[in-house]
């Protein structure tokens, strides 16, 4: 995890000098050049990593489970596909960067940034006025756009798709913000309230974008235009296609491959060997169906394995001042996707035959 974060940070610093100083002056920043980017780069790296971790959570029991190869987005080797899943990776990574920058700004981690008090004193609605310390989402959005969108240098349909989904991620941060209020009045009568906007939990943003992923729109596009945006005609046609979609919606251009199957060229491991859930407390219906989705619907069987877990238990405090625990063993039953026995036997036979030929 730490190595991944450092790799993201190093790559961002490599690409940062391509931003122009004029872009910074427009936004009234106190610094220009590489120093300014260094100020925010640590937050950007953490935000990108948080986005990937949220992706793994949201897709933990899906056939595509946000594998490590998705980090190619942050390192700008490029997610070559333009699938529904790619759209989510761009959106959640962009949201993660904006979220972390906004939160760090409100916490006073940056010298040139603080709370958003631009609306303070204005009447917000019946019985309440704007006040307090609103999270500065505008700042987070602006810096996130410079860093994340700045990595997208192409002009073809795939590049525009990535930029659109980056923006959808930032909009998700703003759309999920919550109004928090404090009451004022004699003896707590709450005759008037002072309210401010706060960031939602990042899990709420992940849930929001997961729904957007499930409802993502496919844009039908000429494959030649997807690869080439150089001509004015191509750029115009691509721009027209994108303009019909709301900025908060996720879009994709290509159908997803079969994630049941292993495909080395695409970096897909398939679902064989994946764990699934059949029983347990507080499982959602989606989680309970994971064995069907990952195993049986992919032509695999569900294999039951018993695992022994050793953990501390019956801990007691002894004066003074130690805690002594017993070591307890617990057998846990887990379920995994495995090949059907007939398929495994056929595979073993083929391997033996190859061995004899050698």
From Swiss-Prot:
Sorted UniProt keywords: Developmental protein, Disulfide bond, Extracellular matrix, Glycoprotein, Lipoprotein, Secreted, Signal, Wnt signaling pathway
Gene that encodes the chain: wnt8
Post-translational modification: Palmitoleoylation is required for efficient binding to frizzled receptors. Depalmitoleoylation leads to Wnt signaling pathway inhibition. Proteolytic processing by tiki1 and tiki2 promotes oxidation and formation of large disulfide-bond oligomers, leading to inactivation of wnt8.
GO MF annotation: an example: protease binding
Entry protein name: Protein Wnt-8
Major localization listed first in the record, in broad terms: secreted
Glycosylation, residue list: 104, 263, 282
Subunit organization: Homooligomer; disulfide-linked, leading to inactivation. Interacts with the long chain of cer1.
Source organism superkingdom: Eukaryota
Positions of the record's site feature: Cleavage: 39-40, 42-43
Subcellular location: Secreted, Extracellular space, Extracellular matrix
Function, as annotated: Ligand for members of the frizzled family of seven transmembrane receptors. Plays a role in ventral mesodermal patterning during embryogenesis. Mimics Nieuwkoop center activity. Causes dorsal mesodermal differentiation of animal cap ectoderm when coexpressed with noggin and nuclear, sequence-specific DNA-binding protein xBra. None of these molecules causes dorsal mesoderm formation when expressed alone.
Originating organism: Xenopus laevis
GO biological process: anterior/posterior axis specification; canonical Wnt signaling pathway; cell fate commitment; embryonic axis specification; head development; mesoderm development; negative regulation of cardiac cell fate specification; neural crest cell fate commitment
One GO CC term, this protein: collagen-containing extracellular matrix
Stretch forming the signal peptide: 1-22
Family from the record: Belongs to the Wnt family.
Disulfide pattern: 55-66, 105-113, 115-133, 181-195, 183-190, 260-298, 276-291, 295-337, 313-328, 315-325, 320-321
């Amino acid at each position: 995890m730490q190595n991944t974060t450092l790799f993201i940070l190093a790559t961002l610093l490599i690409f940062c000098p391509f931003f122009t100083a004029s872009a910074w002056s427009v936004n009234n920043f106190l610094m220009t050049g590489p120093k300014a980017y260094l100020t925010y780069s640590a937050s950007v790296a953490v935000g990108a990593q948080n986005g990937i971790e949220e992706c793994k959570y949201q897709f933990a029991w899906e056939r595509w489970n946000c594998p490590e190869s998705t980090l190619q987005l942050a390192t700008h080797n490029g997610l070559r596909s333009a699938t529904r899943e790619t759209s989510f990776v761009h959106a959640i990574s962009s949201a993660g960067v904006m979220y972390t920058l906004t939160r760090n700004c409100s916490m006073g981690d940056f010298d040139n940034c603080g709370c958003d008090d631009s609306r303070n004193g204005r009447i917000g609605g019946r019985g309440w006025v704007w006040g307090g310390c609103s999270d500065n989402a505008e700042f987070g959005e602006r810096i996130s756009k410079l860093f994340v969108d700045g990595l997208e240098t192409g002009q073809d349909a795939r590049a525009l798709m990535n930029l659109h989904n980056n923006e959808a991620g930032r909009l998700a941060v703003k759309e999920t913000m919550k109004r928090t209020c404090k009451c004022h009045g004699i003896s707590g009568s709450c005759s008037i309230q002072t309210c401010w906007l706060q960031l939602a939990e990042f899990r709420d943003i992940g849930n929001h974008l997961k729904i957007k992923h499930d409802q993502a729109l496919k844009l039908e596009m000429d494959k030649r235009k997807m690869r080439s945006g150089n001509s004015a005609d191509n750029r115009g046609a691509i721009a027209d296609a994108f303009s019909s979609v709301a900025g908060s919606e996720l879009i994709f251009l290509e159908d997803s491959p079969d994630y049941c199957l292993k495909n080395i060229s695409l970096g897909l491991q398939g679902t064989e060997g994946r764990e699934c859930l059949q029983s347990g407390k507080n499982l959602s219906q989606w989680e309970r169906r994971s064995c069907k989705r990952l195993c049986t619907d992919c032509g695999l069987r569900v294999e039951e394995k018993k695992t022994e877990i050793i953990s501390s238990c019956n801990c007691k405090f002894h004066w003074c001042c130690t805690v002594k625990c017993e070591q307890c063993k617990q057998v846990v039953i887990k379920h995994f996707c495995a090949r059907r026995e007939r398929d495994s036997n056929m595979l073993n036979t083929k391997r033996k035959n190859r061995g004899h030929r050698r």
